[in-house]
């Protein structure tokens, strides 16, 4: 079970390599461009070649790319929908260049059109992108359910997986989003019940990645506010219980906790993993 963190790509791929080595991270997540969208600067060919060689030698896993926040595949507005498809397509191309393992896409907002319409729109966009045979696996991420966000329930995720009908479409779960949406991912009983529901509705093989964040707000708040490890409503015991879960410990974990503090959170997470699973902190 590898653990890692979200890192900045500012300064290019060589700077990213330096940050990976400095943090002794086993996996990493990045935005391949500004999280606010805009034009994506092409990778420097020499830097890209060097980074790919480093990735293999270092055995970096996973390498995750996160799409910009501004995209919304569920939008009822045609212009935004088409822009979102184009943006994700470009990120898939860039992810393939990086030999990334996963591209994480948020389930979008229906913007008042209703969940049924929004989910259908999401499926429509994903079908277009999945038909284009990129190598990087797309993961849809659950949400906290703020405002008109969809993807906060397993029923939403199950619908998207089923209606898209593509065996390579996977799921990324976020610990903060789960709690905010009303799922108990803190107690052993709650974690077990959630795992069982996921297996029944979606299938364990679809679960590929965990975003690890504590939560500033309690269960059912519908507020997406990440907190540093052990400082929120999930807490130390919650993460210990997640590490003890056969369902959650079978996938890589990537921290998205706030700055400053995320680097210290990686050290803390490695120590917790060593304590619970007897995996050395630095391998």
UniProtKB/Swiss-Prot annotation:
InterPro entries according to UniProt: AP_endonuc_2 (IPR001719), AP_endonuc_F2_Zn_BS (IPR018246), Xyl_isomerase-like_sf (IPR036237), Xyl_isomerase-like_TIM-brl (IPR013022)
Binding site for Zn(2+) 3: 177, 224, 226
Record EC number: 3.1.21.2
Cofactor: Zn(2+)
GO molecular function: deoxyribonuclease IV (phage-T4-induced) activity; DNA binding; DNA-(apurinic or apyrimidinic site) endonuclease activity; phosphoric diester hydrolase activity; zinc ion binding
Signal peptide positions (record): none
Function: Endonuclease IV plays a role in DNA repair. It cleaves phosphodiester bonds at apurinic or apyrimidinic (AP) sites, generating a 3'-hydroxyl group and a 5'-terminal sugar phosphate.
Similarity remark: Belongs to the AP endonuclease 2 family.
Name of the protein this chain belongs to: Probable endonuclease 4
Organism: Carboxydothermus hydrogenoformans (strain ATCC BAA-161 / DSM 6008 / Z-2901)
Gene giving rise to this polypeptide: nfo
């Amino acid at each position: 079970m590898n653990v890692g963190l979200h890192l900045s790509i500012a300064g290019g791929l060589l700077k990213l390599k330096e940050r990976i080595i400095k943090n002794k991270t086993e996996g990493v997540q990045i935005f391949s461009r500004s999280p606010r969208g805009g034009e994506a600067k092409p990778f420097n060919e020499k830097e890209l070649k060097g980074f790919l060689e480093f990735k293999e030698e270092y055995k970096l896993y996973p390498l995750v790319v996160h799409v910009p926040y501004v995209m919304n595949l569920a939008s009822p507005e045609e212009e935004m929908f088409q822009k979102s498809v184009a943006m994700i397509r470009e990120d898939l191309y860039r992810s393939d260049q990086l030999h990334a393992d996963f591209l994480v896409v948020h389930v979008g907002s229906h913007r008042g059109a209703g969940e049924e319409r929004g989910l259908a729109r999401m499926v429509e966009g994903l079908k277009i992108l999945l038909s284009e045979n990129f190598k990087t696996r797309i993961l849809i991420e659950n949400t906290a359910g703020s405002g008109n966000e969809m993807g906060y329930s397993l029923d939403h995720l199950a619908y998207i997986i089923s209606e898209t009908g593509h065996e390579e479409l996977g799921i990324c779960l976020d610990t903060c989003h789960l709690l905010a949406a009303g799922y108990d991912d803190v107690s052993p009983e709650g974690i077990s019940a959630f795992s069982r529901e996921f297996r029944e509705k979606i299938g364990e093989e679809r679960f590929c990645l965990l975003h690890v964040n504590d939560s500033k707000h309690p269960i059912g708040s519908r507020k997406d506010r990440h907190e540093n490890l052990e400082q929120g409503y999930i807490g130390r015991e919650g993460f210990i219980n997640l590490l003890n879960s056969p369902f959650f410990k079978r996938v890589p974990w990537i921290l998205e906790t706030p700055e400053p503090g995320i680097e210290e959170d990686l050290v803390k997470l490695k120590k917790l993993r060593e304590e619970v699973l007897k995996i050395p902190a630095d391998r």
